[in-house]
Amino acid sequence: MTKGILGRKIGMTQVFAENGDLIPVTVIEAAPNVVLQKKTAENDGYEAIQLGFDDKREKLSNKPEKGHVAKAETAPKRFVKELRGVEMDAYEVGQEVKVEIFSAGEIVDVTGVSKGKGFQGAIKRHGQSRGPMSHGSRYHRRPGSMGPVDPNRVFKGKLLPGRMGGEQITVQNLEIVKVDAERNLLLIKGNVPGAKKSLITVKSAVKSK
């Protein structure tokens, strides 16, 4: 069954394995999440649990939000997200979900929102090849052909310049190197999407090796 937790990306560092190998890791702070709601097939059409992470001031939340979290006897949360495919009987409303649900060596999928890069050209945004840079060439870094003349339009999906980044990305099959239960930290091998302090979702790998 799937298990997951919401956290915040702290940054990257490196640790040494027992054999002396240097391992680059991303540090994710996953303070205890609270189960705000259990969604059932009878009431909602699907099964899921709703997790809340990172308390926020009541002054910044509205009445429906306060009433919703009151059922779980907790404070309003800054980040709320649903997890499907979990073992529903293992969770109760108001229960805390901590980093101890994971252990070192587990393979997980990590979801976050990539860093925004602003308006970028087709070469940086899509990895296209540039034209000759030598004297006489009139084609360097432009997008190139827009397609055939006859349709009198540009087809959807044409790779063009535009806003880059700021998209939800999932990196699959990352290994948990260490779980620090005292400080609510997960050390995950490699890099994960998102800027520092951004929201990260860590879930059991869908395509685990």
Swiss-Prot record:
SUPFAM superfamilies (UniProt xref): Translation proteins
Entry keyword set: Ribonucleoprotein, Ribosomal protein, RNA-binding, rRNA processing, rRNA-binding
Pfam families in the record: Ribosomal_L3
Keyword tRNA processing applies: no
One term of GO molecular function: structural constituent of ribosome
GO biological process: positive regulation of rRNA processing; rRNA processing; translation
Annotated region described as Disordered, given as residue ranges: 122-152
InterPro entries: Ribosomal_uL3 (IPR000597), Ribosomal_uL3_bac/org-type (IPR019927), Ribosomal_uL3_CS (IPR019926), Transl_B-barrel_sf (IPR009000)
Gene Ontology cellular component terms for the protein in this record: cytosolic large ribosomal subunit
TM region(s), chain numbering: none
Gene3D superfamilies, alphabetized: 3.30.160.810, Translation factors (2.40.30.10)
Stated role: One of the primary rRNA binding proteins, it binds directly near the 3'-end of the 23S rRNA, where it nucleates assembly of the 50S subunit. Strongly stimulates 23S rRNA precursor processing by mini-ribonuclease 3 (MrnC); 20-30% DMSO can replace L3, suggesting the protein may alter rRNA conformation.
Family designation: Belongs to the universal ribosomal protein uL3 family.
Record's subunit section: Part of the 50S ribosomal subunit. Forms a cluster with proteins L14 and L19. Interacts with RNA helicase CshA.
Protein known as: Large ribosomal subunit protein uL3
Gene name linked to the record: rplC
